[in-house]
Amino acid sequence: MLDIKLIREQPDEVKRRLARCGVDGAVVDQVLAFDEQRRRLIYEVETRKAERNTVSKQIGAMKDPAERQAKIDAMRQLGDEIAALDRQLAEVEEQQRAVMLEIRNLPHPDVPDGVDDRDNVVIYQEGEERQLPFPARPHWELGEALGIIDFERGVKLAGSRFYVMRGAGARLQRAVIQWLIDLHLEQGYQEVYTPFVVKESVLWASGQLPKFRDNLYRDEESGLWLVPTAEVPLTSLYADEILDASQLPIYHVAYTPCFRKEQLSAGRDVRGIKRGHQFDKVEMYMFVTPDQSYQALEKLRRDAEECARRLGLPFRTKLLCTGDLGFGSTKTYDIEVWAPGVGEWLEVSSCSNVEAFQARRANLRYRPEPGAKPEFLHTLNGSGLGLPRTIIAIMENYQQEDGSILIPEVLRPYMGGMERIGP
């Protein structure tokens, strides 16, 4: 959520930055109109409360019963007016908040202008689009031939966009998750194991609601929601708390399965495991002071890149343009790995600084020094990495002509020393 003070003091600047992301500035005028109503109502409530206090004092000094009763009646009338104004104020505040929750974050000045992902800028690349000395097979062919991905039984169990990992495939999935977590511990993160379901308020705090409601799974009876990413529970880990500056920065890493309805157009990524309703992801999350946040973003990016580097996968890093920037983000890097079987770069990490956007929603604050007024934290999040696209890249880059798949060296200790998944 944006800072109402910024909207009040610099409405034209807020409109200009929103326009870079294609957002109509009329929403700013709407917020300001509600804000004017709110401030007027607050003034009227306070004025009447002051009048009521004056009348109350006068009643105590009155001796004439008729005059005293008239003042009591006047005080009751003021009380009724205050109650009515309070109801109006609550309604206006709710309307203003509803509008503000729909407004995206403002892009950082470094973010390039653009319409969609075609305008994203490659800022770093390590490795080339690997060409194998034999016809590269896509992961779904490799997986079915080796018996490590079972699409038919996944559909039987849960419907389309679900699959089963079996044998060495399931073991590879578990190995990648464990290795990623261990790498991030080495990089200075603390592991957190969160619930995989959350309250609705937690989704509002992270910015998933209201925008992405139709993409989320919810249990109607309990009112709990399945997490679409570990970012959601991690955002609210310290909600409504005031941290000491000495506790910051806080770096967390968490593994969760992720659940998304993700309505896809027919024919798009229909084969394989690239897009599914359930997938695994290891998430990095940072709580930092405002002066640390852009240095923290560079660390987040480096830590995600290191995952691809140690796995021996060709990768590149893109700076997202305004047209492809996420709802809550001010600046985002995407890390993509090359997959020769499908012949495309696959996004395995998206590293974003959201500044105080989530902190305002979740009421995440810190005290800069003892006795100082609490301020909002900045938060950052990044995949480290997302599966199954990492699995796709491993399978397709490490495939052999005989259909077997070599295990990257860093993963072998996590697979009991296994070096190859063979027919």
From Swiss-Prot:
GO MF, any single term: serine-tRNA ligase activity
UniProt: ATP binding residues: R260, K261, E262, E347, V348, S349, S350
Metabolic or biological pathway: Aminoacyl-tRNA biosynthesis; selenocysteinyl-tRNA(Sec) biosynthesis; L-seryl-tRNA(Sec) from L-serine and tRNA(Sec): step 1/1
Native organism: Chloroflexus aurantiacus (strain ATCC 29366 / DSM 635 / J-10-fl)
Protein name: Serine--tRNA ligase
Keywords of the record: Aminoacyl-tRNA synthetase, ATP-binding, Cytoplasm, Ligase, Nucleotide-binding, Protein biosynthesis
Localization annotation: Cytoplasm
Quaternary context: Homodimer. The tRNA molecule binds across the dimer.
Record remark: domains: Consists of two distinct domains, a catalytic core and a N-terminal extension that is involved in tRNA binding.
EC number: 6.1.1.11
Pfam families cross-referenced by the UniProt entry: Seryl_tRNA_N, tRNA-synt_2b
Binding site for L-serine: T229, A230, E231, E283, S383
Main localization, broad class: cytoplasm
Gene Ontology cellular component annotations, sorted alphabetically: cytoplasm
Function: Catalyzes the attachment of serine to tRNA(Ser). Is also able to aminoacylate tRNA(Sec) with serine, to form the misacylated tRNA L-seryl-tRNA(Sec), which will be further converted into selenocysteinyl-tRNA(Sec).
Superkingdom per UniProt: Bacteria
Entries under HAMAP family matching the protein: Ser_tRNA_synth_type1
Catalytic activity of the protein: tRNA(Ser) + L-serine + ATP = L-seryl-tRNA(Ser) + AMP + diphosphate + H(+); tRNA(Sec) + L-serine + ATP = L-seryl-tRNA(Sec) + AMP + diphosphate + H(+)
Protein family membership: Belongs to the class-II aminoacyl-tRNA synthetase family. Type-1 seryl-tRNA synthetase subfamily.
Record bears the keyword Protein biosynthesis: yes
BP-aspect Gene Ontology terms: selenocysteine biosynthetic process; seryl-tRNA aminoacylation
